[in-house]
């Protein structure tokens, strides 16, 4: 079963690539009779092939460019799932200085009972003076839980099932300052409910129905040419959020997240990407709001949410190489850790990651990614949109 999504992904990619080569490479010249013949009606399969064959053409001259993609995908936490994505990119035709804004509406469901839908995007105001970053989603998620702390996560005997019902909304309004600096307020809401707990003792007596209301600020320096698929530039960001009692929080705490990323084209068809990331929760955070090893993005190779504690650190380097036409591949390596106190970090608590991935350019500079990662006594396979970081 775990190989099925890989085979489907490769089969679809091969069909699209072959169709494109047929269209471009072996079309015979028309005879006089052909030139006056009525156009043949295309069936649904031909229309789909034509759509994907031209989906990566540069359409920046269009005021609004919308695309649709769907199909099977896989991750260790959700198993085999069917996903659909409607993606739009838009900008003012009269403002060449402003990057293209983007919006995505997505939905997915799996054979395990997982379903998720939401909307996310980045809206750039004229002349890039302000940016609105938004994300809202709802999910029903059969998951596994190991407990809190590295020792609990590393204990295979703690692996247990539960179901997570979650709603999240986050907003950031960023104002541009000189030298590519952005600063602005941020708001966050989340609802988390754990049900059908196989091992309630692993929650250490914490509540299983949680509302979290947060306010804070974001400060960043961003010179990337394209946030979702950068080839040059760097990003340094600080996200500080407070969850005080007066806002209705049962668990009062604050959370700090810091990220630094750098991208450089070392050769014509190859890019190296570097990321260092850290998150810390102070006070009395609940199990749902603790930092977790970033297994869904940079530190691939682990079950997402397995390792969680008050602090998380990770560092990853990735090489991205164009391969042929719309195809490319990546290789990466890195390390991460979760801990309550810095004194707990040692070679036994480090969590390495390494892996390889396939890339296919769905739209101009928007990639579909398929990654296979290996971690410490763990491995994972996932399919997604855009680069991991």
Please identify what each model-predicted range represents.
Residues 53-64, 92-100, 126-131, 179-180, ...:
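Short loop/turn motifs that connect adjacent beta-strands in outer-membrane beta-barrel proteins
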Residues 58-68, 72-211, 367, 375-389:
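Gram-negative/organellar outer-membrane beta-barrel architecture
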Residues 65-74, 98-111, 117, 234-244, ...:
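Transmembrane beta-strand segments that form the barrel wall of outer-membrane beta-barrel proteins
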Residues 68-70, 86, 105-107, 132-136, ...:
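Membrane-embedded beta-strand positions of outer-membrane beta-barrel proteins
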Residues 105-106, 154-159, 200-206, 242-248, ...:
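Extracellular loop and loop/strand-boundary signature of outer-membrane beta-barrel proteins
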Residues 215-220, 224-322:
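C-terminal outer-membrane beta-barrel translocator/porin domains of Gram-negative envelope proteins
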Residues 216-219, 355-363, 378-389:
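Outer-membrane beta-barrel "beta-signal"
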Residues 281-369:
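Outer membrane beta-barrel transmembrane domains
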């Amino acid at each position: 079963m775990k190989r099925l999504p890989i085979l489907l992904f490769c089969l679809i990619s091969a069909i699209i690539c072959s169709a494109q080569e047929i269209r471009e490479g072996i079309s015979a010249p028309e005879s006089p009779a052909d030139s006056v013949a009525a156009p043949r009606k295309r069936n649904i399969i031909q229309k789909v092939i034509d759509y994907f064959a031209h989906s990566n053409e540069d359409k920046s001259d269009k005021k609004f460019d919308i695309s649709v993609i769907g199909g099977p995908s896989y991750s260790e936490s959700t198993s085999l799932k069917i996903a659909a994505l409607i993606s739009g990119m838009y900008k003012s035709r009269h403002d060449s200085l402003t990057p293209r804004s983007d919006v995505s509406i997505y939905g997915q469901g799996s054979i395990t009972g997982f379903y998720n839908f939401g909307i996310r995007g980045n809206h750039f105001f004229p002349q890039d003076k302000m940016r609105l970053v938004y994300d809202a989603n709802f999910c029903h998620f059969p998951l596994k839980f190991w407990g809190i702390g590295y020792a609990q996560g590393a204990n295979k005997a703690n692996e247990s099932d539960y179901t997570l019902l979650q709603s999240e909304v986050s907003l950031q309004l960023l104002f541009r300052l000189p030298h590519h600096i952005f600063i602005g307020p941020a708001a966050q809401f989340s609802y988390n409910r754990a049900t059908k707990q196989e091992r309630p003792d692993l929650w250490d007596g914490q509540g299983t129905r949680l509302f979290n209301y947060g306010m804070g600020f974001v400060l960043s320096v961003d010179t990337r040419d394209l946030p979702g698929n950068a080839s040059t530039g760097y990003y340094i960001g600080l996200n500080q959020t407070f969850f005080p009692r007066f806002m209705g929080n049962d668990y009062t705490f604050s959370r700090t997240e810091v990220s630094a990323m750098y991208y450089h084209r070392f050769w014509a068809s190859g890019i190296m990407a570097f990321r260092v990331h850290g998150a810390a929760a102070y006070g009395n955070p609940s199990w749902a709001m603790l930092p977790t090893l970033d297994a869904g993005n940079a530190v691939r190779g682990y079950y997402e949410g397995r390792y969680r504690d008050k602090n998380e650190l990770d560092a990853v380097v990735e090489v991205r190489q164009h391969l042929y036409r719309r195809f490319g591949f990546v290789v990466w390596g890195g390390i991460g850790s979760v801990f309550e106190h810095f004194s707990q970090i040692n070679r036994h608590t480090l969590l390495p990651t390494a892996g390889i991935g396939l890339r296919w350019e769905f739209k101009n500079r928007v990639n579909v990614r398929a990654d296979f990662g290996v971690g410490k006594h763990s491995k994972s396979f996932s399919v997604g949109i855009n680069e991991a970081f």
